[in-house]
């Protein structure tokens, strides 16, 4: 049981640390709290006066929670582009829980079942490697930082490590120049609001190189102007 307690607790701390570096930290932050809560529940279970529970319960729990996190995380990673942490870490939990359950049946399984279990376990590991590569190695997409930058403007958070300027400056994308155009436009408007003509012109010049203001959706600039109270 202590193995599972340490696993859930360690993953909770690790995910929380990663969440602080994300454009939308609350998504993976909530997942970290769920895992920490589970580790506390398992710890309380070890101190219960009466035992006799299912020793495989933590493995089932890891499989269910991890599998659910993978589904949710893949949507956030590939569809809405909001988070890249939940899916790979959920996959780790799912792999550990599932492989533990498969290994428990290994000795009593026939050859066909053993081959099937091995293929299934190998497939899970390969998929997990992809999730780690896509989420933790490739990392956050530029569009995610651009979206979070707009949110920070709406909150009035402009400066600092978690301000709108910092988020937009992390949103550069070598493949999608339209994202760069949106970010340069946003930064130009922010510096216009602050009467920083030098910085504003730097981003206007960069914006002109990739199509100018015409390359930016009017709805984007109008929304930013509204939040910045620019006429």
Task: Describe the residue ranges of each PLM region.
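TPR/TPR-like (Sel1-like) alpha-helical repeat modules
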Residues: 188-215
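Residue-level detector of the short coil/turn that links helix A to helix B
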Residues: 156-159, 195
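Structural register within alpha-helical repeat arrays
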Residues: 148, 185-187
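Residue at a conserved register position within TPR or TPR-like alpha-solenoid repeats
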Residues: 152-155, 191
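Tetratricopeptide repeat
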Residues: 162-165, 172, 201, 208
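Boundary/linker segments of alpha-helical solenoid repeat arrays
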Residues: 176-181, 209-222
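Long, contiguous interaction/recruitment modules in multidomain scaffold/adaptor proteins
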Residues: 1-144
